[in-house]
Amino acid sequence: MVGLSNGEIPLVQIFVRDNNVDQALKALKKKMQREGSFREMKRHVHYEKPSEKRARQKAEAVRRARKLARKRAQREGLLPMPKKPGR
């Protein structure tokens, strides 16, 4: 996101090879997901008050901290490792 100012969404470029539009759409969706474009667009649908923004950011930070603590506890053997699906 170099050179972007005032919250602009970066342009994503995808090449269509051999008229394979389905594969190009899949690649576009994956790229936008990785860059966080969907989340950003969803966030800009409605105005978010500064107090709501702070509350959201704080909740996200708490969620990240809990996840990190849970992973750390699992690594140290304090919690059982999560079960893998399909096994």
From Swiss-Prot:
Q: Which GO terms describe its molecular function?
A: structural constituent of ribosome
Q: Which family does it belong to?
A: Belongs to the bacterial ribosomal protein bS21 family.
> Highest lineage ranks of the organism?
Bacteria, Pseudomonadati, Pseudomonadota, Alphaproteobacteria, Caulobacterales
Gene name as annotated: rpsU
**Keyword Ribonucleoprotein in record:** yes
Biased segments, Basic residues type? 64-73
Its Gene Ontology biological processes? translation
Does the entry feature the keyword Ribosomal protein, yes or no? yes
Chain intervals for the UniProt region annotation (Disordered): 47-87
Q: Which InterPro entries match?
A: Ribosomal_bS21 (IPR001911), Ribosomal_bS21_CS (IPR018278), Ribosomal_bS21_sf (IPR038380)
Q: Name one GO cellular component term.
A: ribonucleoprotein complex
Q: Where is the composition biased (Basic and acidic residues)?
A: 47-63
Keywords for this protein: Ribonucleoprotein, Ribosomal protein
The record, for Pfam families, names:
Ribosomal_S21
Q: What is this protein called?
A: Small ribosomal subunit protein bS21
Organism, scientific name: Caulobacter vibrioides (strain ATCC 19089 / CIP 103742 / CB 15)
